[in-house]
Amino acid sequence: MPRQHAIEDYRNFGIMAHIDAGKTTTTERILYYTGKSHKIGEVHEGAATMDWMEQEQERGITITSAATTAFWAGKRLNIIDTPGHVDFTIEVERSLRVLDGAVCVLDSNQGVEPQTETVWRQGDKYKVPRIVFANKMDKTGADFFKCLADIVDRLGAKPIAIQLPIGAENNFKGLVDLVKMKGIVWNDESLGAKFDYVDIPEDLVEQAKEYREKMVEAAVELDDDALAAFLDGNEPDEATLKRLIRKAVLTGAFYPVLCGSAFKNKGVQPLLDAVVDYLPSPIDVPAIKGTDDRGNEVVRKADDKEPLALLAFKIMDDPFVGTITFCRIYSGVLQSGTGVVNSTREKKERIGRMLLMHANNREDIKEAYAGDIVALAGLKEARTGDTLCDPDKQVILEKMEFPEPVIEIAIEPKSKADQEKLGVALAKLAAEDPSFRVSTDQESGQTILKGMGELHLDIKVDILKRTYKVDANIGAPQVAFRERVTKKAEVKYTHKKQTGGTGQFAEVSIVVEPNEPGKGYEFESKIVGGAVPKEYIPGVEKGLNSVMSSGVVAGFPVVDVKVQLVDGKYHDVDSSALAFEIASRAAFREALQKGKSVLLEPIMKVEVVTPEDYTGSVIGDLNSRRGQIQGQDMRGNANVINAMVPLMNMFGYVNNLRSMSQGRATFTMQFDHYAEAPANVSAEVQKKFA
């Protein structure tokens, strides 16, 4: 079947925002007005189409980014719904990676919130073109102009209003379209499906002129001809203006800001028009780069004629279809039944069922093209971030980077049957979410779950109990400490064992020193003249690696260390890779002691938003948790406190904060860096773990 929509008519975009800014409601309305949903799902009734996992419907927050295809103005929209809670930023990173553009939704009562900043920074990292939608204009305290100021102050970006609200709060009637210079008002009886263009209300004419002038001036700066014409007194026509605004979005010169209330069904259709008019198609963004099987850089253009390349960006377990792998096709054509190679893992796969997803309804397809986002059923080897490609033209697309988990809990199944179910379930959950790790404690034999925060692990445990029916005891959350050396140390170690017959002999000299923070572990062999034969070097590395997972302070993983193998001795008969492994392990442990290893603890960036009355109590409490206050400012009538606090002191903080502020203060927390733990904390941890 030939392609039904030209690739320039595709819009692959995501909707990103702070939790509770109304992102899922906005997506729901988009699905309703594009004719995909017959009944509007309300988040607060737990019925939103995109939020299809049970846990999401109960908590009213979006956890997994569901991908949906819809159509508007002859264009094909592939929408990725992303979570706004900080514990799920991995989902956001992953979806931004495969999008061409994004709509950033703000709560116009709150302006730019902490998680908005996080997702905005992630958007900057992947250079995602964005437009902004100031939502909830019907709410008490809604302030469109504060949103504009916040974008400058908190995001350091240049916002340009292309709409203005008509009224606000209870009187929010509609909006002024500054491109057309017309008002738009909605018909409430039709659930906002019908709207009319009207003259701009008299009391807004001056304001509309002022903001239109700002918009036109910003736009014409991007084009010499338009600027020359403008300076001669000729305003750009509507088509030129749209072309220039589009150029601004694609280059990041400025960000168009729209407004509305998705909940009250106002402003959604113009938002869809803006997606079509201003967000890029797959051919408007730079072609994706990768490396071929020889390690050379190659480019894959968004074109059906190019060799096939697709990226797996999400894996889900579906009760009816089994494992579903969401993929973005960057180039070429994918047909069901064809063989592909997973170049990341060097495994062959056959494409079975191909599905187009609509939240959790699905449509079988036989063929998909460059620019499509498809769900593939039954892939055996694929993991998040893997590349699937043409076996004859192999490529590995850019890898995604996933953050290290900072919190862990032990889980013990209650019975043998639960043990078996747990194993299967954890393998599936770890495949779906790379920021969720599973390991076994070597000494206790316990299964350890690691994640990005308490909520992240709560939800995983919930899924284990509900979806996989695993009955288990859950331990208290533990902090993921690390260890590192603080000074250079040189150690020579000889391993000798003689017990009749062949003995064991190996001698190594190593130099261990701190590496730059974040640089991780680096090994270098400085051996010259065969003091340690080449075939034994892997044995040395194996020994060093075995110590990296369990340091000398309290048995936590060692980070940011450089190890050089500078000298050694071997014996023709008694030396072996195993002997060198044992020698290097002992040498490394001794060097870590000599190099004054210290305990590192995760430090979290905490932002508390509280009414003025509770500021003193909140700051006092943060100080008592070894927090360092970084600054305060006002947001509306609330006080915003920024602090760096050790994670080990933040457990159960949510309940404390609630009781301290009578439920009126909120906080967000995300991992910032590792820092050396004070001596008393280190001693306490050593007593507990060593």
UniProtKB/Swiss-Prot annotation:
Pfam annotation, one family: EFG_C
Main location: cytoplasm
Binding annotation for GTP: 17-24, 81-85, 135-138
InterPro entries, sorted: EFG_II, EFG_III, EFG_III/V, EFG_IV, EFG_V, EFG_V-like, EFTu-like_2, G_TR_CS
Keyword annotations from UniProtKB, A to Z: Cytoplasm, Elongation factor, GTP-binding, Nucleotide-binding, Protein biosynthesis
Residue ranges crossing the lipid bilayer per the database entry: none
Function: Catalyzes the GTP-dependent ribosomal translocation step during translation elongation. During this step, the ribosome changes from the pre-translocational (PRE) to the post-translocational (POST) state as the newly formed A-site-bound peptidyl-tRNA and P-site-bound deacylated tRNA move to the P and E sites, respectively. Catalyzes the coordinated movement of the two tRNA molecules, the mRNA and conformational changes in the ribosome.
HAMAP family (alphabetical): EF_G_EF_2_B
Name this polypeptide is given: Elongation factor G
